[in-house]
Every structure is written in structure tokens, then in C-alpha cells.
């Protein structure tokens, strides 16, 4: 059969494999491409192709990530797989590879292990909306009761992290046997992908979300007023619409009287556009880099929050020494540095942590000296003297 022309007429969804080391994430990823390739919906990627992922840099942090794409009858998927545990932590916290959902791989031979838990917690903290469980290596377990016990254990674990443990699909698979072409295990990969199609919700497109643009620069045009430039992160803004300026000072409303892109006037700007917005009744000194323009009421300014943070190792250009609660770095949020204080660190089990070492993945409570437009899932960097020493994501807003 001729390979069907690859067309982007299906909804696009970003997913990834997560789970404990050696539970078969990469093998399963290879198995998905092998099985779908037989229907002309993927190109075969073998273990070595995926495992030899090139290094990428995201916000000054080096991350190894493999990107694989394939499609099902219903959707087009971009799938990320990371070779090492630290790569997952960095990837999920920086948002380098945005995930709309994830396949949690757990070996039936081992059951949930330390990183199984850590990845579920990370998925919760960074806002991965949905999970599907692939119970891998089921060909190696003869006793159906053992498989049932492992499934129960995973469901309880998911529920303990506020995922709907009773409802999440758990599919018994064998990545290795599927690659070897055994029909019953190939069928299980199809079953897994059906579950992914059905259980991982289609993401809302950026353009359909409420308008937000982080201000990068401000200048005044004589006789016309003040222009704020930046890249529209999401939504659409039309000439004549009211927007709100949020962050650093008290929020205030203004009307967009013009949208410019590449020196041309437009009726509207949309997600992804780099634009200049002409604002009515605003002086150049009223607004500055670090503020955002938003659909009124869609986002609020805050100073206190909790975040999940990865602290860079010395080899990654991070600090050489640990730091403690009370540490005052800069938080780089969207387009600007804001000074803040880290008031507390919390371990995975909820206990207080005194000292944080380079290379740690930790929950922290932070307080900024001035309010910034903030929401759950927002990414930030922690810097000192212009150098990135950590990456984080807002997991909770306090005030």
C-alpha cells in the first residue's frame, strides 16, 4: 500500500512517556511507532534512534529529549521521551516539552517505584491534565493476580496525588513483544492508543484562550500615544477592545487603538504575533517591561506562591554551594526579573527542608517584592546576577 500523504487535518496533541528508570518507556515508545507504522501512521523508530536523543537547551538548561511523531485514526501526536530521570524533571519543570497528557509506564514485574511516584507528583505540580497507565512487561508475569495487585497499587498511588485513580485506564502491554511482532501484544498497543485518544483531552488552542501579551518594550509616538510591544502569548486582540495592564503597579484599563506588525496596521493581532499595540490615555511612564496586557479580569497580580523548582547543578552553570530558606534571588517571570524571597522549602512528603543543594528538585514558597500577573502552571527562572540557577513552575497561588 502507498504511504498516505501526511496531512495536518487532525487535532494535534502533545504527550510523553513518564515513569521509573528501566520500566520500558523508550521501548514502549518504539513499540507504538512500530505498530502504527504497519498502518502507515508512523515511521518506525527503534530503541537506539530514540535513546540517542540530542541535547537541547531551554532557558540555559541542557536537556536530552527525543521527539517522535505519529498519528492514530483520530489525532496527530507529538511524543517526548527522555533518556534520564534528571531530563524528565528539567523537561517538565521548564515546560520545554509541553505535555497535554502522559503515558505512565510501570513494569508489572516491579510495581510502582521511587521515580514512578516522583513523576506522578511532577505531573500534578506542573499541571499535566491527564494520564493513561501502560502496565509494561506483562509477558514476564504469569500470575494474573500479581498484575491485578500492581494495578490496584498504581490506582491508589494516583488517587493519593489527586488524579482520578479509579477512572484512569490501565492497559497491560509488552513493548518488547509488540516490537517483535507478536499479534496479541500488537493489539495491546492499539488498545493503549485508543485509551490515549479517549482519555487525554484535546488541548484548547492558544488562540482560543483569553488574550495575554507580556510587554517587552514601550515607546511613545508623538501625536499618537504610547505603544507597547511584545509577542502575543495567547488569544486575539482587536482594535477598539479594552485591555487591562497588570503587574508591578495597580491594574488599570485602557483601549487598544491600533495594532501594528512589521510596520503595517492590522485589525487584530493573534497568538504568536509580534506586535505593537497603541494604547489610549496611557503615558510612557505608566507602563514598563514586566507588565502584561490582558483581557480584563482574566488574570490577577500576586506576590506569594508555591512552585516546583529544579536547582541547576554546578556543571550546568548553577551554584556551587547550597542555599537556605530566606534566600533572595531574582525571579525571571515572562520578560523581567523581580526580586523575591524563598521563605520555605518542602520535601515530597510535606516535611520542611532546611538546605537545598544544586541538582535538587524541590517545592518552595516564594514571595515577590511587587505583584506580578501570575497563574497556575506559569514558568519562571531563578537567577542571581543575570545567571540562571534554577527553573520553576507555579503550582499554587497563595495571595
Swiss-Prot record:
Residue ranges of domain tr-type G in the record: 10-204
Residues covered by region (G2): 60-64
Keywords: Cytoplasm, Elongation factor, GTP-binding, Hydrolase, Magnesium, Metal-binding, Nucleotide-binding, Protein biosynthesis
EC number(s) on file: 3.6.5.3
Reaction it catalyzes: GTP + H2O = GDP + phosphate + H(+)
Positions with a binding annotation for Mg(2+): 26
GO molecular function per UniProt: GTP binding; GTPase activity; translation elongation factor activity
Binding residues for GTP: 19-26, 81-85, 136-139
Renumbered residue ranges of the record's region G1: 19-26
Subcellular location: Cytoplasm
Segments of this protein annotated with the region G5: 174-176
Listed SUPFAM superfamilies: EF-Tu/eEF-1alpha/eIF2-gamma C-terminal domain, P-loop containing nucleoside triphosphate hydrolases, Translation proteins
Residue ranges of the region described as G3: 81-84
InterPro entries named among the record's database cross-references: EF-Tu_GTP-bd, EF-Tu_GTPase, EFTu-like_2, EFTU_2, G_TR_CS, P-loop_NTPase, Small_GTP-bd, T_Tr_GTP-bd_dom
Region (G4): 136-139
Source species, domain of life: Bacteria
GO cellular component assignments: cytosol
PROSITE patterns the record matches: G_TR_1, G_TR_2
Entry similarity comment: Belongs to the TRAFAC class translation factor GTPase superfamily. Classic translation factor GTPase family. EF-Tu/EF-1A subfamily.
Function field: GTP hydrolase that promotes the GTP-dependent binding of aminoacyl-tRNA to the A-site of ribosomes during protein biosynthesis.
HAMAP family, per database record: EF_Tu_B
Subunit structure: Monomer.
Protein name: Elongation factor Tu
Gene name linked to the record: tuf
Amino acid at each position: 500500500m502507498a504511504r498516505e500523504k501526511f496531512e495536518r487535518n487532525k487535532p494535534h496533541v502533545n504527550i510523553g512517556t513518564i515513569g521509573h528508570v528501566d520500566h520500558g518507556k523508550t521501548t514502549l515508545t518504539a513499540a507504538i511507532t512500530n505498530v502504527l507504522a504497519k498502518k502507515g501512521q508512523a515511521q518506525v523508530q527503534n530503541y537506539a534512534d530514540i535513546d540517542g536523543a540530542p541535547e537541547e537547551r531551554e532557558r540555559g538548561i541542557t536537556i536530552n529529549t527525543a521527539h517522535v511523531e505519529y498519528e492514530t485514526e483520530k489525532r496527530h501526536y507529538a511524543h517526548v521521551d527522555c533518556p534520564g530521570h534528571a531530563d524528565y524533571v528539567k523537561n517538565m519543570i521548564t515546560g520545554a516539552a509541553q505535555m497535554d497528557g502522559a503515558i505512565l509506564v510501570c513494569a508489572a514485574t516491579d510495581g510502582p517505584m521511587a521515580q514512578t511516584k516522583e513523576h506522578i507528583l511532577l505531573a500534578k505540580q506542573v499541571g499535566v491534565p491527564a494520564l493513561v497507565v501502560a502496565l509494561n512487561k506483562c509477558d514476564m508475569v504469569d500470575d494474573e493476580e500479581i498484575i491485578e495487585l500492581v494495578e490496584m497499587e498504581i490506582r491508589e498511588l494516583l488517587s493519593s496525588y489527586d488524579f482520578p485513580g479509579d477512572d484512569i485506564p490501565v492497559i497491560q502491554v509488552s513493548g518488547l513483544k509488540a516490537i517483535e511482532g507478536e499479534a496479541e501484544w500488537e493489539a495491546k498497543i492499539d488498545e493503549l492508543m485508543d485509551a490515549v485518544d479517549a482519555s487525554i483531552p484535546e488541548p484548547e488552542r492558544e488562540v482560543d484562550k483569553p488574550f495575554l501579551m507580556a510587554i517587552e518594550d514601550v515607546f511613545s509616538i508623538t501625536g499618537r500615544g504610547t505603544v507597547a510591544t511584545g509577542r502575543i502569548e495567547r488569544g486575539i486582540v482587536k482594535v477598539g477592545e479594552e485591555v487591562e495592564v497588570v503587574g508591578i503597579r495597580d491594574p488599570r484599563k485602557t483601549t487598544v487603538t491600533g495594532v501594528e506588525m512589521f510596520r503595517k496596521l492590522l485589525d487584530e493581532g493573534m497568538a504568536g504575533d509580534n506586535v505593537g499595540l497603541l494604547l489610549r490615555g496611557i503615558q510612557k511612564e505608566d507602563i514598563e517591561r514586566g507588565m502584561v496586557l490582558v483581557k480584563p479580569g482574566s488574570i490577577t497580580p500576586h506576590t506569594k506562591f508555591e512552585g516546583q523548582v529544579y536547582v541547576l547543578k554546578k556543571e550546568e552553570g548553577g551554584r556551587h554551594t547550597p542555599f537556605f530558606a530566606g534566600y533572595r534571588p531574582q525571579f525571571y517571570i515572562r520578560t523581567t526579573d523581580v526580586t523575591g524571597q524563598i521563605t520555605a522549602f518542602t520535601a515530597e512528603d510535606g516535611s520542611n527542608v532546611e538546605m537545598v543543594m544544586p541538582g535538587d528538585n524541590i517545592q518552595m514558597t516564594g514571595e515577590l517584592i511587587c505583584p506580578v500577573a501570575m497563574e497556575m502552571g506559569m514558568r519562571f527562572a531563578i537567577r542571581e546576577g543575570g545567571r540562571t540557577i534554577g527553573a520553576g513552575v507555579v503550582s499554587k497561588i497563595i495571595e
